[in-house]
């Protein structure tokens, strides 16, 4: 198998597994009465420990980032506003609605990123970016109102946490680039997850005796942490390195689709026609942004003409 096909397969598998992890989280919260806060705490702590262990085995100097005062502060900011907030708001959205809706709303983050950079740089967005912003807004409108502006198809709390999740995901994607370039992805993400989980520990550790535990729930939690977080993250990284960010972004659109399909098959949650239309519009915005990124990359790499 060629490197491009292998990369595409890795990203596609990662996207499907990420979609299934949201469904798995919904199953755990519904069947065990576990709060989204407690699940966020335990998921972050265990996933962080696994990623740091993998990083250490890989030969990374995982403690270097902590020994640098300035970078340690940046890591703390990323841990709180990035890793902790993106996981907590995502699970809160699931708790208030369902995994498929939460996943689709979080996919607004690429549009938020390009809109933010256009504002900061005071540059007019290109036609593809403008269309992406427009389709994401229309898609969100259809998803949350079913086309009726006088009513919401999801609760106001679900809408609030879903939008917050998208903004948190935008921050999570853009903020740590300097840290990752200096220390590597696994140490930065591993520490951010572990620190984020430990921050919640004093507030929610006592909830550990207030929910149902059985064999299927333990298996589901193992899947969520090991398969849906650690393995998935590694697959996506390897795939994105082989095929590049724009292609990886397009293939990652399989995540909300797999979440919607698995929600239907495993949890009995159905999407209506406006839900599907809204989802497809939001996913199309991601594809448009990826197309714009590829166009810009080709323009930059194009050799200059000589007279």
Curated annotation (Swiss-Prot):
- Ranges that cross the membrane: 8-28, 46-66, 72-92, 100-120, 125-145, 152-172, 185-205, 217-237, 264-284
Looking at the record, the residues that make up the EamA domain are 16-145, 167-291
Q: How does it sit in the membrane?
A: Multi-pass membrane protein
Which coarse location class applies to the principal site listed for this UniProt protein?
membrane
Residues on the Cytoplasmic side? Answer: 29-45, 93-99, 146-151, 206-216, 285-307
Choose one Gene Ontology CC annotation of this protein and give it: plasma membrane
Which stretches are Periplasmic in the membrane topology? 1-7, 67-71, 121-124, 173-184, 238-263
Known InterPro entries for this protein?
A: AA-Vitamin_Transporters, CO/AA/NH_transpt, EamA_dom
* Keywords attached to this entry: Cell inner membrane, Cell membrane, Membrane, Repeat, Transmembrane, Transmembrane helix, Transport
Q: Does the keyword Transport apply?
A: yes
From the Swiss-Prot or TrEMBL record, state where the protein is found: Cell inner membrane
**Homology family:** Belongs to the EamA transporter family.
- What is the protein name given in its UniProt record? Uncharacterized inner membrane transporter YicL
Gene label: yicL
